[in-house]
Amino acid sequence: MKYADEFRDKEIALGLAKAIRAEADPRKPYRFMEFCGGHTHAISRYGLEDMLPKNVRMIHGPGCPVCVLPAGRIDMAIRLAERPDIILCVYGDLMRVPGSQGASLLKAKARGADIRMVYSTIDAIRIAEDNPGREVVFFAIGFETTTPPTAVMIRLAGKKQLENFSVFCNHVLTPPAMQNILESPDIRNIGRVEIDGFVGPAHVSTIIGTAPYEFFAEEFGKPVVIAGFEPLDMMQAILMLVRQVNEHRHEVENQYSRAVSRDGNLRAKEEVSDIFELRDQFEWRGLGQVPYSGLKLKRAYAKYDAEVRFDMNELRVDDNPACECGAILRGVKKPVDCKLFGTVCTPETPMGSCMVSSEGACAAHWTYGRFRDHQQRRAS
C-alpha cells in the first residue's frame, strides 16, 4: 500500500538500527520520550525497542488523551448522565475509563443512564436534532488534533439554533504538559525521570506545526524531532535525536515533513481560537494540575458549555493507590512495574486508564510486549 509499505521496509529498518548502534556512544545513556500515544503503540507493535542498543531508552509519555483524563472528570460525566433529561454522547474509548470506586460510563449505562457512543461530532448534532425534548451533551476530549472538529460542531449548533445541545469540554494542550514534565520532574512520590530529547507528536503537529516546540529546544536545551507513525519514521527520528545529542545540538527537526509544516493548519487554529480560551489550570492524571493546559468555551459560547449550563461542580478524586498509571504516564515506570498489570488489570478489566485506550502504554504492552517479557524470562 503506497505511503505505508514504503515506511515498513524491513531492510531499511535494519539499516537504521545498525546506524543507531554505530552512532550511539555506549558510555552514556540516551533517554528519549515519545509524547504521542500513537508512537507508543507503534513502538510496541513493531518491536522497535528490541532493535535499539540497551543504552537508548524510549520513555512513554502522557500522549494519550483518554489516559490523562482524571477520574474526577469521569465522575462528573456520570453524575450528569444519570439525570433523566440528559443524553450523553461519548467516544467509545471513554466508556471503560475508571472513575472513583470502580465507576465507569459503561456501568452507568448498564444502570439505565442514556449514554450513547458516537463516531463523530456530527453524530451528536443529529442526536440533538432528533431529540428536541432532551438535553444532549457531547463529551469532548482530545489534544489539539480533535479540538477543531469540536469548534466546528459548536459553530454548527449555533447556525442550526440548537437550544438543547452543549459540550462537556476536556480538550487539553500538548506543549504545557511537556513543559510541566521538564519543570517539575518530581511530583509527589512518583519519582524523577531524566529526558535527553523528545519524539514530537505527529497528528498534533499537523495542527499546531513545529514552531511551538522551539521553546523547549531554546529554553530547556532539549532536542525535538517530529515523527510519523510508521516504523521507519520512528527509527529515523531516534537516529536524528542520537545525532543531536552527540553533536550537542538542541533543535526542532521535522522528520514528518510529508504532513507537518512549521506553522501547521492555520484555518484549524483560527477556528479553535474563535471558540475556545485557556483555563487557568486543568488536572491531568499523573501530572496533577497543569497551568494553562486545558480549554474551555469562551463567554460568547457559554450557553453551549455544559459545565456552565448545568452548574457542574469540579470533582477531584484520588486514583487507585495500587495502580501505577500516574508514574507510567510520566515515564517514571513501565507497565511491568505495576503489580496490577496482567493480573487484575487487563483490557477486559482495566484498573487504570493506561489499560483502556489502544494508545495507552499498558494496553500497547499487553497486546504486543508481554509475550517478549515471557520469552525473556524463559531465556534467563
Curated annotation (Swiss-Prot):
Pfam families for the chain: HypD (PF01924)
GO molecular function terms noted in the UniProt entry: 4 iron, 4 sulfur cluster binding; carbon monoxide binding; iron ion binding
Keywords: 4Fe-4S, Iron, Iron-sulfur, Metal-binding
Coiled-coil zones: none
Binding-site residues, Fe cation: C36, C64, C67
Family annotation (InterPro entries): Hyd_form_HypD, HypD_1, HypD_2_sf
The keyword Repeat is assigned to this record: no
Superkingdom per UniProt: Bacteria
Pathway membership, UniProt: Protein modification; [NiFe] hydrogenase maturation
GO aspect biological process, one term: protein maturation
Cofactor: [4Fe-4S] cluster
NCBIfam families xref list: hypD (TIGR00075)
Role, per record: Involved in the maturation of [NiFe] hydrogenases. Involved in the biosynthesis of the Fe(CN)(2)CO cofactor.
Entry similarity comment: Belongs to the HypD family.
Protein name as catalogued: Hydrogenase maturation factor HypD2
Organism: Bradyrhizobium diazoefficiens (strain JCM 10833 / BCRC 13528 / IAM 13628 / NBRC 14792 / USDA 110)
